[in-house]
Every structure is written in C-alpha cells, then in structure tokens.
Amino acid sequence: MTSRFSLLFSLFCALCFAFSACEREDNPHILWGNGTPPALPTPQPQPSPQPSPNNPSPNPALPLNAQQRADAARLEMPQLTGENGELFIVHRVANPQGRDSIVNYAYAYLPQSYHSRWVAFRFDAQTRSKVVGRKPYDAKPQYPRDPKLPTAWAIPSDLPFGRVYDHGHLVASADRLFSREANDQTFYMGNMSPQLSSFNQKYWTGLESLVQDLGRNRSFADTLYVVKGGTLAPLSSFGYAANGKMPVPHHYFMALLKVKNGVYSSIGFWVEHKNYGKIGVPREMGKHAVSISALEKLTGINFFHNLPDAVERRVEQTLTLSSWSL
C-alpha cells in the first residue's frame, strides 16, 4: 500500500513539474555582442503641448542635465516626449576658434526601434561653410556604432541593412562639411535609416541639395533650422532592416525654419519612400511641400515649439513656395 501511494505521489509531482515547464516562457533579449541589454528607460509622461516661451523646457519629466536642457531649448529642436524610452542625443565638435564646442546635430532616439524619431541641426555662420569633403569610402568602419548610445541599444558598426536598402543619412554627409569631425559624426549608425538605394542615391538627394543650397546662401537666411526623419509607427512603415530590428519608414519628412533680419518663415516636406525612377530635381520638390502645421499632424511631432507661441502659430500655418525658391 505504501509503495503504491509513493508511486502515485511521484507521478503527481512529475506532472506538476511538466505543466509548469510548459507554461514558462523565456523573456527574449536582443543581444548585440556578448552582453545582455539593460531594461529600456522608463517612459515618461506626455508633456504639455505648448511650453511657455519664457521657460522652454522640452519636458520637465525628462531626466535632462543642465546642458541637455539648454540644447533642447534651441530653435531647431522639436519637443521631446519622454515616451517609449526616448533618448536625447547631442553631438558636439570642437570650435576652431577655441571657444565653447559647437552643436553639430542632435536626435531623439527610440531604443525599441533602433532608429531616431527625428534629427535636428542648423546652418549658420559657424556650420554652413564647406571646408572638408565626404569621409573616405575606404575608412573602416564606414558606419561606426554611435558612441553616445548605450551599447545594448545601439546598432553595431557597419551592420548591413539588406540587399535593397542603403545606410541612408538623415543628417546628410553634405550637410556637415565645416570640419572633419563634424562630417565623420554623420556616419554614426544612430544617424542612419534604411532607404531604398534608388531613393537614397537619386530622388531624396534632390531635396537634400535644395536644403544645402538654401542653408549656405547668406542672402537667403541668417540661420536655417532643419529637422528630418522617417515614419516609424507600425502602420507607417513597411518591413524591417538590420536583422529585423529597424523599421523601414514609409515616408520621410523635413521641417525647415529660416530667420532673416528677424523675420521667420517655415516649410515642410512629406515624401513617400519609393523608387521614383529618376534623380530628384531641387526645383521640383514643391510637389511635396506642406505647412508645418500639416506636417505636425502627419508625424505627431511638435516642431519649432521653442518659438514664442504667437510667432509659432503664424509661422507654422503659413506656406509660401516662392519664399523657398520653389
């Protein structure tokens, strides 16, 4: 009797263990290299949509230090949200005059997408000059891991995007030619987006050339503020690159704000990511133009929010193509 009871008890324990083993799921981790990534940064609450121009904090809930808060208050910076573990990354370069370092460009990075939400920079007296050329093609790595991103949430150096996608610069190499360091920083993987080769090398360059020509034209603008990016929402992207980690945007956008003699004006561009079968011509880019107000609705991004509210409303609702050589 005792042996029969022991046998039944053993069978019961074995079944319980089997069921518990079947119900347990491993928590998958994305591994770059040999380490296990840390938890995503804790999402922060949504900020108020219109910060006071007298206190242009991007989001008081974001854990920004004093320097980051100052950088986030620059006119080119869209509003930070703190959602989905958003990271605010700023790349600076040495000032050839030996003064404070120069902000080269910045971006809001979404770790779960391994892609930036937007990149932002400006053409001004310090950054519009053309002193150097493109980073040499034989330089290795050609596309380094961004050293400012946590290793676990950064795309590794030179990771291929697949046969049909290029490493598409968001801040173009030709946007940053004022120093060797500034140009080299545009090749960081954090500045890359998977773009169709025909789009990256032909059509998109038409819009990039327009922006570069305007940004370097002192008679056009004292400062040209630029924001670029691609759509990342699941319904706004098609497929993934970088070993299935990085969404391929369905659209790319640009938001431009210029100031000349204290007068502001703006324009947005909304461009479908596809093979256009031709080289983009700068003067034809007007077909993709939209107001900043419309672009904000398309992207969910609050552009140029550091302007005084009255100026922001006027500038973002007005679109005059002739003011942009279109």
PLM segments and residue spans:
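Bacterial N-terminal signal peptides
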Residues: 9-18
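Domain-level detector for secreted/extracellular nuclease and nuclease-toxin modules, and
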Residues: 22-326
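Bacterial N-terminal signal peptides that target proteins for export
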Residues: 1-9
